[in-house]
Amino acid sequence: MATIKSLFSTLLDAYTKNKELLSVANNAGAHNGIYRGIDLTTKYTEAQISAKIQAGDFSDLYIGDYIPKTLTIDGTSVTSNWTIAHFDYWMRIGGSDMTQHHVILVPSNCLYYKGMNASDTTSGGYKGSRMFTEDMPKVATALKSAFGSSHVMSFSNLVSISVNTSIASMAGGGQTGGVPTWSWGWETRECDLMTEPMVYGGTIWSSSSCDIGSGKAQLALFNLCPTAMNIRSYWWLSGVASSVCFCHVDNSGDADANGASLALGVRPFFLYH
């Protein structure tokens, strides 16, 4: 018993002397390594959350923490837990430099279900898709209505802009067609579909390096809590897999690709501050 008391006393003394060293720093690097998963609105107002993020003070904000919101798109409302997936992911990235502190938020479920295009084609790459030109602007409008326009950040994203239907896809498996080298462009965005690396940590079905764009690293949410990607729904990613297929996450959690006209889930991300 005396030995246990002595050990406890030693540990308590060490903690007292070094608690500053043992505490979690308030920066992005430290907070991208800790998952919690609570409703932030039970502790803070949204104004307080936003003020902390804009100041780069991520104290008591952790991966998996969320803000419940209801978005209305094309007359249909859907409630999601908009979850912190990464702190300062886009910092110093883009055709124009990103210098503002932010968090990436992703919904806990799909907002709705729709094809990337009206037919099974990937012509024009991600930029040329109906999802890019029509659906993402609708989502952005709904986000600004729900969160407030000043809290939905614009960011510069590198996206694919064309597809060569005759080249071999880097996805393998006999797939034909893909995004040619240098077939990309910088686009100013307010929300977008995630890339394969943002979800899986690497490419699986993406046809070329141009499908990766700015989303080149895995989001901390999916690294720390892989079940966050497995929501028992099919949901689209931005990568071109072939001349007729885009990448997606399967309802069983597998990486997959399928015809662009299929009505799969829309699960975008945006930068919140």
Regions found by a protein language model. Give the residues of each.
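Collagenous Gly-X-Y triple-helix signature in extracellular proteins
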Residues: 22-273
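Short, low-complexity N-terminal tether/leader segments at secretion or assembly junctions of large
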Residues: 1-23
